[in-house]
Every structure is written in C-alpha cells, then in structure tokens.
Amino acid sequence: MKIKEIGFVGIPVTDMAKARAFYENILGLKPDPEMTGEKWTEYPIGTGVVAIANVGGDWRPSDQGTAAALEVESLEGAIARLNEHNIRYDQVESPVCRMAIIQDPDGNKLIVHKLKPENKKGSDV
C-alpha cells in the first residue's frame, strides 16, 4: 500500500450547530457549501480537509488519542483570538514548533500550531 496524502481528518461531534459555531466563528474556518449538511460539514484547509460529523454509533468525541494540528500564520494572533473568546489552552514549545493545545465544545483536542522558520518544509536546514 502506498498512501499519497491525507484525504480528510474526521472529528466526531454531538451538536453540529455548537460545533460549527466553534469551527467557523472562533477558528475562522469556511465550510464547503457542497459538503455541508445536518450531520457532516467539511472545511477545506490548504490541500486538506477537516470534517466534523454527528453520525452517532461508536464514533464519539474524545480528549484521548488523535489530535489534528492546524498550522496558523501567526501563533500570537491565534492566541489573542483564543483569549478573546475565553478558550482555554496549554501553550507548548518544542525544538521545531510552538503550539496551543485546545479543545472543541465536545472535548476533542486540536493543536493550533506554528512551525519555527528554520523547520519549514523545503528549508535547507
């Protein structure tokens, strides 16, 4: 098997209206009008997609395990926006990036992420 790219990251939610308000109004994501419905909404980001879904069954929100890392233009700007909306976060710095770890209204972990300039893909370092 040869995996070419990530098709989408799926995030389970329990309340689509509340989740959409968070992903659109706080994170600033724009929904794809052709992929928006009562139980599924997709947000194109670069060449990828973040999808939120309320499909029930065994696919439930969790703060354990996988977290999507969303690269931002400015971590300082993102943190200001999180503060403006009273979103709690843990700020972490690694050798390659800076990030704020947050949770959506269902408790799913998300990472607001900014690579340090010397670690950008395609750099000579």
Sequence positions of predicted segments:
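Acetyl-CoA-dependent GNAT
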Residues: A53-G57, E93, K114-E118
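Short secondary-structure boundary/capping segments
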Residues: M1, D32-P33, T41-E42, G57-P61, ...
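Conserved beta-strand edge residues that scaffold enzyme active sites
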Residues: G37-E38, P95-V96, K121
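N-terminal beta-strand motif that seeds the catalytic metal site of vicinal oxygen chelate
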Residues: M1-K18, T47, T66-A68, K116-V125
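Short, charged/polar, Gly/Pro-enriched secondary-structure boundary elements
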Residues: G48-A51, R60, D106-L110
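Active-site beta-strand termini and strand-to-loop segments that position acidic
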Residues: Y43-G48, I102-P105, L115
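Core segments of cupin and vicinal oxygen chelate
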Residues: G10-V50
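Vicinal oxygen chelate
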Residues: M16, A68-K109
